[in-house]
Each structure stands twice: as structure tokens, then as C-alpha cells.
Amino acid sequence: MSSVFSGDETAPFFGFLGAASALIFSCMGAAYGTAKSGVGVASMGVMRPELVMKSIVPVVMAGVLGIYGLIIAVIISTGINPKAKPYYLFDGYAHLSSGLACGLAGLAAGMAIGIVGDAGVRANAQQPKLFVGMILILIFAEALALYGLIVGIILSSRAGQSRAD
């Protein structure tokens, strides 16, 4: 019996840390975006209640960010089964980087959506022509989270390709 530490005992920790970070950070972004743009909708709705349903778009877009984190967390957690097949440190680090890529991109997108949504719905109440511009900016902010989701899927697919030497 060798006393050399291979690191495989700690690899699932990094994998589950990646799953948790994907969900936690993306939900933090979703919560911030929902809260910030929701405050804008509520304050705008006092003066122009007929625009509330039209101005709910940033709140919905922010809520979608949590789903991206959930997708990556499920992909990662289904790939962690050290009893069925060997799970190396490479796999754990791949899953950790996957979760961080998706989670932090979701956090950044949520902050952008919240700030743009808050200012956008208030400005839309005063000048309705700004609605299309607000939607375009929100789409670009949402694309940040999509980039993180795509990179997260690519990185998590790299797990399981390592082999013991």
C-alpha cells in the first residue's frame, strides 16, 4: 500500500463546488437583477400603471439567469459518480471551472440587467421611444450569461477525458 496522495479522494469536492458555485452565483445575479429592475417597475407603476406589464421584461430576463446555473449544476452533478467510474482531479477541476464560468457570467449579467432594467423602465415611462433601445441592451446583457452557459457546457464535457498515468 503506497502512501502517495493521488488527489482522487478530494476530486468530488471540487466537482460539487463547481455545481454549487454555478447555482449560487447565477441565482445571486438573478436575484439582484430581479430586485433592481423590480424596484424600477414598482416606482414607474405608480405614475403609469398601464405600462407595468410592458415593463416586466427585465424582471423575466433576470429570472432566466437562475435556470442557466441550474442547467450546469445538473450537468455537473450527474457527472460525479466516483463509485461507477474513476473521478480524477482533472475532472473535479473541469467541473469547478465550468461552474465558475457559468455562475460568474450569470452574476455579471444579472447586475447588468438589473441596472439597465431599472433605468430603462423609468425612462420608458417618460419617453416610450426608449423601449426598443432598452430591450436591445437587455439582450446584450443576457448574452453574457449565455456565453457563460456555453463555456460551462464545453468545460464540463471535458471531464471524464483524463486517464491515470
Curated annotation (Swiss-Prot):
Pfam families: ATP-synt_C
Origin superkingdom: Eukaryota
Compartments where located: Vacuole membrane
Residue ranges that the UniProt entry lists as topological domain Cytoplasmic: 34-55, 118-129
Cysteines engaged in disulfide bonds, as pairs: none
Record gene name: VATP-P1
The entry's keywords: Hydrogen ion transport, Ion transport, Membrane, Transmembrane, Transmembrane helix, Transport, Vacuole
Role this protein plays: Proton-conducting pore forming subunit of the membrane integral V0 complex of vacuolar ATPase. V-ATPase is responsible for acidifying a variety of intracellular compartments in eukaryotic cells.
TM segment ranges: 11-33, 56-76, 96-117, 130-155
Quaternary data: V-ATPase is a heteromultimeric enzyme composed of a peripheral catalytic V1 complex (main components: subunits A, B, C, D, E, and F) attached to an integral membrane V0 proton pore complex (main component: the proteolipid protein; which is present as a hexamer that forms the proton-conducting pore).
Main location: membrane
Organism the protein comes from: Oryza sativa subsp. japonica (Rice)
Family annotation (PANTHER family): V-TYPE PROTON ATPASE PROTEOLIPID SUBUNIT
Signal sequence segment: none
Topological domain ranges for the Lumenal compartment: 1-10, 77-95, 156-165
Membrane-related topology note: Multi-pass membrane protein
One of the record's GO molecular function terms: proton-transporting ATPase activity, rotational mechanism
GO CC list: membrane; proton-transporting V-type ATPase, V0 domain; vacuolar membrane
Family: Belongs to the V-ATPase proteolipid subunit family.
UniProt name for this protein: V-type proton ATPase 16 kDa proteolipid subunit
Annotated positions for site Essential for proton translocation: 142
